[in-house]
């Protein structure tokens, strides 16, 4: 006999068989399961605890998987996974061979669209709604998007497009940054039921039809309706986009959610439902500090997440300390982040230099062009951005920064593999797409101290420059307190050997040094991907039988390709082995294990080099 309601749910069909009165009890069970599950695996907790009731209501009302639900970003999709046959698989969440932390089309028919980056859901759901229209299907498409993701321009581009259609698209705004008083909440819950009801919709259409013969009167009536709704709801903006706005409603009241969604399901045209939720709902530590519990490692639910112990600083912390030190030295410095203050190490800077700190929201394109405008007038911007999110601002980097040779520093965090977050968040491609941009200096530090020095080099350079560094801690190198730069385009030889020269970039210098001890190989810390150290490459090519390039980036178009191109330009013929990330998307898992699986740990490097050496003619 099942011990709980949750044990009876293997699919949304089982959920829809329950009486609505049992949903609150199921929500409590799901919440308890989430806390225990994420405590054992790590993952996103606060956002998932806040979306339990909303997820239950959506699957209860809509005929999934026939109807499509697109989860923006996707880190709030754990309840969705639990309800769609993956409850037992949650024990392997974000681990190698286990289920992903984000929706994946290849993982389940219920995952309508793969996500990981923000603000894509409305565009994708609109495309699905149009496809259903083209195919003559009555299927429905729903986009669930958070308030943070609504800061991105792409979301508004999609709203603008959708509002001009008559497609039955539903956009659900999961607003966990808005407080709602009991009185206003009760009023809005009532109005939501009214505005989503068939009578209201029918009366609205009939009135519009009657007044169509008198456009001035119709416009007056429309404005009067917007004024009345605007007195108690904040939805005028979405009405202007052409949506029927409903809400805000309590996102933890299942009765209100289910009834409102049932009404909306039968409405014509684009609908916008504003739902207010609380991050960390049901787990006091997460409610108190949702930022700390946004993404967590394994923890004891009874004790909560432990603060980080003192130890080796992460590259992110090295950057944050450097930024504050350089800001104290140069009053022209400003720091910019696209909604990643904590993740990019800008907390201390934001506190010590609040007038020089800019969080522009999830708006990477704007962040770079904003930086370009600052640089035009003599300010020195530093943009702290994840490698994977820099992809979204590629045109701005080329057109607005590099083309004008503006002194903007890009501090590129999470370069290379990122472990449990998987391919949507990996920084596998930045060297490949950056090194073809004219006038852009690209550096990759091998340890914490070199990271600090290369950041100073980039900042003091009179042109665009990028420093890319990995997630996590470095080698434990002693960090010098100064702000001295290094010479641009010059590497350093770390070890002298024979036959083989390992040209290592960034994070792979350390495993290269370990492998070199067994191979008796030369190791060069190249430091710069662009410009390359021409003299060093030529010297190493002249004195070794085999050159091996090492990078935590895609081999295609990466640093190794740059070395091969340089050798061709110089007319030097020497065997080159390029080691890096192969031409596949690297799945989620422990970062060190994934690097080893790619053959980029010391044993893997030794093995690959030995095999190539053995194949060379004597």
UniProtKB/Swiss-Prot annotation:
Q: How is the cofactor bound?
A: Binds 1 Mg(2+) ion per subunit.
Q: What is the lineage of its organism?
A: Bacteria, Pseudomonadati, Pseudomonadota, Betaproteobacteria, Nitrosomonadales
Q: Where does Mg(2+) bind?
A: 147, 176
Gene Ontology biological process: 1-deoxy-D-xylulose 5-phosphate biosynthetic process; isopentenyl diphosphate biosynthetic process, methylerythritol 4-phosphate pathway; terpenoid biosynthetic process; thiamine biosynthetic process
Q: Which SUPFAM superfamilies match?
A: Thiamin diphosphate-binding fold (THDP-binding) (SSF52518), TK C-terminal domain-like (SSF52922)
> Carries keyword Metal-binding?
yes
Q: What is this protein called?
A: 1-deoxy-D-xylulose-5-phosphate synthase
Q: Which UniProt keywords apply?
A: Isoprene biosynthesis, Magnesium, Metal-binding, Thiamine biosynthesis, Thiamine pyrophosphate, Transferase
Kindly give the SMART domains that the UniProt entry links to this protein: Transket_pyr
* The protein's required cofactors: Mg(2+); thiamine diphosphate
């Amino acid at each position: 006999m099942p011990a709980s309601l949750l044990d009876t749910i293997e699919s949304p069909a089982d959920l829809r068989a329950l009486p609505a009165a049992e949903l609150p009890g199921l929500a409590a069970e799901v919440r308890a399961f989430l806390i225990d599950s994420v405590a054992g695996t790590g993952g996103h907790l606060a956002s998932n605890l806040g979306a339990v009731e909303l997820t239950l209501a959506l699957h209860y009302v809509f005929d999934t998987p026939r109807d499509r639900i697109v989860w923006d970003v996707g880190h709030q999709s754990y309840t969705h996974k639990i309800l769609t046959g993956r409850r037992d698989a949650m024990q392997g969440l974000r681990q190698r061979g286990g289920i992903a932390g984000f929706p994946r089309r290849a993982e389940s028919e219920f995952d309508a669209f793969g996500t990981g980056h923000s603000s894509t859901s409305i565009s994708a759901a609109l495309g699905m709604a149009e496809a259903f229209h083209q195919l003559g299907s009555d299927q429905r498409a729903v986009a669930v998007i958070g308030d943070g993701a609504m800061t991105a321009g792409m979301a508004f581009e999609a709203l603008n497009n959708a509002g001009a259609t008559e497609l039955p698209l539903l956009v659900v705004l999961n607003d966990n940054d808005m407080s709602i008083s009991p009185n206003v909440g009760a009023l809005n819950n009532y109005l939501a039921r009214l505005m989503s009801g068939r009578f209201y919709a029918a009366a609205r259409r009939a009135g519009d039809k009657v007044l169509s013969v008198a456009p001035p009167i119709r416009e007056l009536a429309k404005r009067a309706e917007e004024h009345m709704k605007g007195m108690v709801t904040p939805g005028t903006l979405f009405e202007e986009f052409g949506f029927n706005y409903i809400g805000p409603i309590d996102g933890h009241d299942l009765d209100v959610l289910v009834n409102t969604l049932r009404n909306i399901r039968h409405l014509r045209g684009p609908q916008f439902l504003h739902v207010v939720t609380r991050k960390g709902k049901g787990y006091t530590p997460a409610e108190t500090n949702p930022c700390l519990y946004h993404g967590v490692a394994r923890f004891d639910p009874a004790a909560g997440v432990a603060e980080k112990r003192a130890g080796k600083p992460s590259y992110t912390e090295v950057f944050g300390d450097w930024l504050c030190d350089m800001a104290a030295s140069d009053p022209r410095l400003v720091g910019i982040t696209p909604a990643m203050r904590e993740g990019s190490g800008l907390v201390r800077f934001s506190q010590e230099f609040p007038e020089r700190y800019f969080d522009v929201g999830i708006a990477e394109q704007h962040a770079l062009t904003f930086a370009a405008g600052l640089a035009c007038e003599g300010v020195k911007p530093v943009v702290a951005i994840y490698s994977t999110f820099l992809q979204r601002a590629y045109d701005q980097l080329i057109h607005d920064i590099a083309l004008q040779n503006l002194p903007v520093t890009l501090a590129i965090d999470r370069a290379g593999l990122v472990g449990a977050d998987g391919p949507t968040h990996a920084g596998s491609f930045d060297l490949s797409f950056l090194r073809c941009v004219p006038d852009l200096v690209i550096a990759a530090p091998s340890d914490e101290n070199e990271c600090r020095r290369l950041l100073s080099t980039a900042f003091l350079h009179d042109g665009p420059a990028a420093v890319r560094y990995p997630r996590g801690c470095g080698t434990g190198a002693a960090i010098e307190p100064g702000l001295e730069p290094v010479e641009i385009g010059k590497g350093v030889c770390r070890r002298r050997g024979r036959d083989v020269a390992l040209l290592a970039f960034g994070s792979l210098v350390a495993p290269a040094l370990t492998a070199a001890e067994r191979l008796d190989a030369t190791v060069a810390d190249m430091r710069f991907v662009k410009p390359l150290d021409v003299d060093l490459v030529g010297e190493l090519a002249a004195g070794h039988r085999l050159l091996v390039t090492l990078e935590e980036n895609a081999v295609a178009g990466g640093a190794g390709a740059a070395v091969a191109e340089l050798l061709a330009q110089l007319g030097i013929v020497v065997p080159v082995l390029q080691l890096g990330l192969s031409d596949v998307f690297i799945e989620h898992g422990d970062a060190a294990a994934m690097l080893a699986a790619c053959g980029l740990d010391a044993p893997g490097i030794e093995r690959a080099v030995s095999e190539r050496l053995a194949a060379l003619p004597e």
